[in-house]
């Protein structure tokens, strides 16, 4: 999703593959998968990000997600 990241592609791909495997294990349809992923993002923001930064980070995340989805359409 991110153009530039401080994390290596290998590390990101490994975590992504683990998360996909969990969703497949539970045979989660797209809507349930999105609910779970959304709840995970919310939990990360609430538990790990200061109150003053949450909205800004949530906006940056949603903008990056929209940019990624729009890029996939072309």
Swiss-Prot record:
InterPro entries noted in UniProt: UPF0352, YejL_sf
Lineage: superkingdom: Bacteria
Coiled-coil regions, chain positions: none
Any Pfam family hit: DUF1414
Family: Belongs to the UPF0352 family.
Entries under HAMAP family matching the protein: UPF0352 (MF_00816)
Protein name: UPF0352 protein PM1884
Species of the source: Pasteurella multocida (strain Pm70)
